[in-house]
Amino acid sequence: MQMPSMHRYGHPGQNQRRENQSIRNYLSTRSGSRNRISRSPHNMASVYTRAPAIAYDDDTYDTLEESEDNGFVKTIPNEEQFDNSRGRDRTRSGRSNGHSFLGYLRDTFTERQPSGRRGSDTSRDMINASLKSRARSRRRSSSRRRHRNASMHMHFRGGSRRSATGSQNLINHDRHRRISQSSLGSSREGEYNHASRSSRVRRRHRRSSRRRGPRAGGHGDSFTSITPSGSAEHPISDIDQKRLRKNSDTSSRGTRESPIDDSFGEDNYRLVSRNRATSIYTTPSALYTRTESLKTYKRTTGDSKGTSPALASFLEHKTLSADVINHIPLLRMLESVPRSEAIREDELLYMSAKTFKYVSHWYSNSRPDYANGKMYTSPPPENALAWKRTAKQAHALILHLGRDSLRSSVMSLRELNQSNAVLFLLNSCLKIAICIHKNKMHKYGNVKILSTMPHVRKGDAQIFENSTIHTMRDPMASAARASYGSLAYWPELRCALGSENKRIVRYAIVAMLQAEIYLLTRISSQRVSMNKSELRILSSCITMECVAACIAVQFLYTSLWQILYSSKINREYIWLKTASERSKKLPMASTDLLYAEGACLGRLESSLYGTEGTPLGRTLVEAYLATRSAFTELIYEFQSNSDLFLEKQNVKLGEKLTAAVITATVVLQRLLGHLNIIIAQMVIGSVYHKKDVDVWSETFKMYQYLSYVCKSLYRPVTIDEYINDRDDTMEYLTLEFARGDPPTGMASVIYEDEKSEELESLKLVPPPINYDILGNLVPLRNAIEDASDVIFEKRAVETARREPQRAN
């Protein structure tokens, strides 16, 4: 009579157990000790049923099947089998003849022979295989030692059927334990044999199925439940679980395997077995359900007065950032990015930098191509952009100042990946929206441009009013805020945004990088090599970029509100709706930015065009145009898909909306870092070197407003901090500022590339007569006082404020 492998080795899903050994290999050869094995229904030696459909000498695990036809379910014994009087009589007769229970088992299973594939060496092979089998899990030594004696007792009721040799077995228990451990291997060392297994069975009555944990019995695993009738309920096995995981791993990225195809696939989102978004950095919330997330996007109706949209139950009270993020479709951006795709994306970013020849990439540890030593910041010849030697040095300096500091943090933190960066950006968006909605910026005076922007009514955005969303404080967040807005240089992060969005990010950051490089070739601690027209263009670009950043912040506020709320009666929706209709005609769909361009650049047309134009001025303006074009594209993309998302509630469209918001946040952070650098350069050139320049009076009010609202996204750097960072980087790169022009052998120059199409097609519209959004032109020394707390150190500000009092 053969017995099924399920009872001998447990459930077939336990993949660490062997299925093909004979039961005799698990029994001690010292039968004279007359030790018995537990006859519980859960022990393998107690089942007398037919053989399974598999060969005992077949060591292939994949041949197991879990259908009801293979004997695993039908051969499970019930209580009647163990109450069979004939079996009891046979057992008594075996004992009365002086044979032990182990000898009885040998007689019972004598006729069972495995297939003859291995010939006479079958038993020896089985013994070797049994000694190699490992336990699936181990107990603590104390727990194993505490319940080892349980296997030495019979589990019949009242002990009336205990044999005469039972007491002797208990006396010789210690000796038998040493023998069994030496002959069959100690269970403490991980060897899985019958002695170690049966020693874990707890003392129990005949019909009791209680065990000391899920691994103590044979088939009483945590994955299988035994019914009172003796039948088993089998859920999905480990084999099928492995297959599911394998299939999900191979298809999780779907279309992302190709570095060219980055389209958002709806099929990828159907992999519901993946962890939720916030499980990467926080404990999953019990509030989240798939049905509740869909309620958030349902369309609501109301009267023209403006009613609060219907919210899911979890949004009606104070919530955490994890609960909010779970209801924003972004799983597509949290998937891993292949290294080959990221390397290709990094190469595309620096293809436009042909002027600098070799450029160090994100995954490269080598320095860029530049000359050590003196760095000359004198003005180049007429119509030239910069000295080539100085431009290469400035390129290495700017990249090490921002990008390389972030890269070193990413490489040093193993748990840091682009998924953490996406969650950081989304958390920053939520903090920005809450800060705008709650404070309304009255604390920072009357910023005129804010008066033209709509505000969500109180009660229409409870998520912004009642949420307790905290700013992320982990090492990754600190590194992202303190690297001059360099998250845009991270190739994996750009790939996670999608094919169209990463192209937009590349276009913006390349233009800003070139402007920073060529500006650094003209300003140093020793001299400023910029004429008056170039300083005026720099001042105008700072003003226009502050206006663009304020509009971008407002876009994040309104877009997040529209993703979380589907009401169309609010003023915010009207603003976004009209923005989509005019975004192709207006920069960032804003008349304020249109008039700001006319006011700032209208008086500088002669410095931009014609023979008197300056290449450096055009480079600075091109950086601004590229940034505002990127924002304009993202605003149009968001609004063109938002109507369809509200109507169809399509997950694919929802992920596109979220990707547009995250991309705008990436560009905004890079713009804030760019503003920080060029403002520091202008202050060094104007205040420290006494170069007078006029600035619009509202410029630094907007900059202070941005510094406060976006403090969760970017940490502004003061002038003193910037100078210290720059000097430390130059010392690391073995560079030093020098006066005069480069020597004759190093005096090659860089000329401007082909003129920008955007700059050539730029049409300036003069503002109306009563237009007062930008204020008046004032000297830089006076305008900078509005943001002195952000630009200068606190000690310097306090000292400057005490000086007028001492003079009086």
Curated annotation (Swiss-Prot):
Record's compositionally biased regions (Basic and acidic residues): 83-92, 235-259
Reported phenotype of the disruption mutant: Deletion mutants are unable to be horizontally transmitted to naive chickens contrary to the wild-type virus while skin tropism remains unaffected. Mutants show also an increase of unspliced glycoprotein/gC transcripts.
Keyword set, alphabetical order: Glycoprotein, Host cytoplasm, Host nucleus, Late protein, Transcription, Transcription regulation, Virion, Virion tegument
A Pfam entry, by short name: Herpes_UL47
Compositionally biased spans, kind Polar residues: 162-171
Leftover remarks: Expressed in late in the infection.
Annotated function: Tegument protein that can bind to various RNA transcripts. Plays a role in the attenuation of selective viral and cellular mRNA degradation by modulating the activity of host shutoff RNase UL41/VHS. Also plays a role in the primary envelopment of virions in the perinuclear space, probably by interacting with two nuclear egress proteins UL31 and UL34. Plays an important role in the splicing of glycoprotein/gC transcripts and thereby participates in bird-to-bird viral transmission.
Free-text domain note: The nuclear export signal is CRM1-dependent.
Subunit organization: Interacts with US3 kinase. Interacts with UL31 and UL34; these interactions seem important for efficient virion nuclear egress. Interacts with UL41/VHS.
Record protein name field: Tegument protein UL47 homolog
Organism: Gallid herpesvirus 2 (strain Chicken/Md5/ATCC VR-987) (GaHV-2)
